[in-house]
Design a protein with these regions (language model features):
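Mature catalytic domains of secreted/periplasmic carbohydrate-active enzymes
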Residues: 1-233, 238-254, 264-276, 280-284, ...
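Predominantly extracellular/luminal regions of secreted and cell-surface proteins
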Residues: 100, 284-305
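Short intrinsically disordered coil segments
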Residues: 124-128, 185, 243-244, 289-298, ...
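Trp- and acidic/polar-enriched beta-sheet ligand-binding modules for extracellular glycan
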Residues: 190-195, 217-284, 305-308, 317, ...
Length: 408
C-alpha cells in the first residue's frame, strides 16, 4: 500500500484540497483479504527511504526505534525519541538506549523506470538506461534496502516495448555478474565479534570490482562498521569499507587483481553472523549522454532580467509550445519551486499569464525535469516564472533550470 505522495501524509489535489484517507479501514481490508500482502510506509512491513530517485543510504538498520504509523502509539513514541520516517538515525546504540521497543522495519527504495510514475507515449525514449538502473540497484539492494521499480502500463494495459527491452537487458547484466563468484568457500558461516577478521581465497587469476557481504538476518542485524581488503601483488589493499551490512551490502571499486580477500569487523553488537562473502567482476557500463531534449532554444541568446520572480529575455520573439522546470543536479532543495504561475510578454512590460496546472507534482521526492505543455501556440520574447516552495515561501529558480520548446 502506497499513498500518492509516498509519505502517508494527507496529499493535496490540484485544487489544494486535502485528500483524507481512512487508514484504519485500509488496514482492516488488506488484513482481511490479503493477510500476507506487504503494507508499505503507513503499514508496518517496510518504510520509505525518503526519495523517489532510487537512492539508498550508507547506514541502514532493519531493526529500528521508529514506531510504524499503523500503531496508535506511533505519534507519541516517535515524538519522544525525536525520530521520523526519513530520520538519519533510526537504529544507533544511542537511539536504542532511549527506546522501549524495536520494530523490524526495513527500508524500501522506490523509483520509476521512466521520468514519472505513469505512462506517457512521449517518454518512450526516456526509459532509464542500463547504467542508471544498475547504479540504482547497487545503491538500493546493495545498501540493505528493498527496491520497488515502477513499470507503468500503457493505455492498453501493456508494458511498452522500450521498458521490456530495458528490463531484459537489466536482468541479463545482473545474471552475468552473479553467475561467477570468485570467492572460494564464501558461504562458510562466520560468527564474528568486534575486532575479528576472516580471510577468503579467490579463484586463480581473479580480477574483481564488486564485493557482496551478507548477514544471517534470522539472528538479527549486528555489524556497525567493517573494512574489506584485497591481497594484490603489492600486498593488502583496502577496496572498501562501510557501516551496516544487514541482508545484503555491495561495494564497488576499481578493478583489482587479487588472490585473497580479508574482511574486518571493526564494530558489531555482540556476535555478528556473516553467512556469505562474495566477489565478482561487473563489466563497466557507459552512460549515453543526451542533450537537453526539453530545451531547443540556445541559452547563449538569453538574458536574465530579474531574479525574483525569475524573468528572462529570450533574445528574440518565438512561438512556445511548452516550458520545463528542471531542478539543478536533480536535487530536492528547500528553495525549489512547487506551485507556479507562468507569464509571457513581447516587451517585458505587459504580461499575460499562460493557463497551466500550476503545480510541479511530487517534485520534492522526484526532482526530475517536469514539462508543462501549453496546448496552444504562445508568442513571447520574455518569460516570467512566479513560484513558491513546498512550504509556500518564495522559490529560487535559476535560468539554467528553465527550458523552452519552440515551434514554427
Amino acid at each position: 500500500m502506497k499513498s500518492e505522495d509516498s509519505t502517508g501524509r494527507m496529499a493535496k489535489g490540484p485544487n489544494g484540497k486535502k485528500q483524507v484517507y481512512d487508514w484504519d479501514a485500509f488496514y482492516k481490508t488488506i488484513q482481511r483479504l490479503q493477510p500476507k500482502a506487504v503494507m508499505a510506509i503507513m503499514g508496518d512491513d517496510v518504510r520509505w527511504v525518503g526519495n523517489e530517485r532510487g537512492l539508498g543510504r550508507e547506514t541502514e538498520w532493519n531493526a529500528t526505534v521508529l514506531t510504524p504509523g499503523i500503531y496508535a502509539r506511533s505519534t507519541e513514541n516517535n515524538k519522544r525519541l525525536g525520530v521520523f520516517s526519513k530520520a538519519e538515525d533510526l537504529g544507533s546504540r544511542k537511539m536504542l538506549e532511549k527506546a522501549t521497543e524495536l520494530f523490524w522495519y526495513p527500508s524500501e527504495v522506490d523509483v520509476s523506470i521512466r521520468p514519472g510514475w505513469f505512462y506517457h507515449a512521449e517518454e518512450d525514449a526516456k526509459v532509464k538506461s542500463l547504467k542508471h538502473l544498475s547504479d540504482i540497484y547497487f545503491q538500493s539492494v546493495g545498501y540493505n534496502s528493498v527496491l520497488l521499480l515502477n513499470i507503468p502500463p500503457d493505455r492498453k494495459g501493456l508494458i511498452n516495448e522500450a521498458d521490456v527491452n530495458r528490463l531484459e537487458e537489466f536482468a541479463a547484466y545482473r545474471e552475468q555478474i552473479f553467475a561467477d563468484n570468485r570467492v572460494k568457500k564464501g558461504r562458510n558461516y562466520w560468527n564474528a565479534i568486534s575486532g575479528s577478521e576472516a580471510v577468503y581465497s579467490l579463484e586463480p587469476g581473479s580480477e574483481i570490482n564488486l564485493v557482496m557481504l551478507q548477514e544471517d538476518i534470522t539472528k538479527g542485524q549486528r555489524v556497525e562498521s567493517f573494512v574489506v581488503e584485497a591481497l594484490t601483488d603489492n600486498g593488502w589493499k583496502e577496496v572498501g569499507k562501510g557501516t551496516t551490512i544487514g541482508y545484503k551490502r555491495m561495494l564497488r571499486f576499481p578493478v583489482v587483481k587479487a588472490s585473497q580477500l580479508r574482511v574486518k569487523i571493526d564494530e558489531c553488537r555482540l556476535t555478528a553472523h556473516i553467512n556469505q562473502v562474495a566477489a565478482y567482476y561487473a563489466a563497466p557500463l557507459q552512460e549515453v549522454v543526451q542533450g537537453e531534449d526539453w530545451n531547443n532554444l540556445p541559452r547563449a541568446g538569453w538574458k536574465q532580467v530579474a531574479d525574483s520572480p525569475l524573468t528572462i529575455d529570450l533574445g528574440k520573439s518565438v512561438t512556445l509550445a511548452s516550458f520545463t522546470y528542471a531542478p539543478s543536479k536533480a536535487e530536492a532543495k528547500p528553495t525549489m519551486a512547487f506551485r507556479y504561475k507562468f507569464f509571457v510578454s513581447m516587451d517585458g512590460k505587459h504580461w499575460k499569464e499562460v493557463p497551466a496546472n500550476g503545480e510541479f507534482s511530487n517534485i520534492m521526492h522526484n526532482p526530475l525535469p517536469q514539462t508543462v505543455t501549453f496546448g496552444q501556440k504562445v508568442q513571447a520574447r520574455y518569460i516570467k516564472l512566479e513560484a513558491t516552495t513546498p512550504t509556500a515561501t518564495t522559490a529560487k529558480v535559476g535560468m539554467d533550470e528553465i527550458g523552452v520548446i519552440t515551434t514554427p
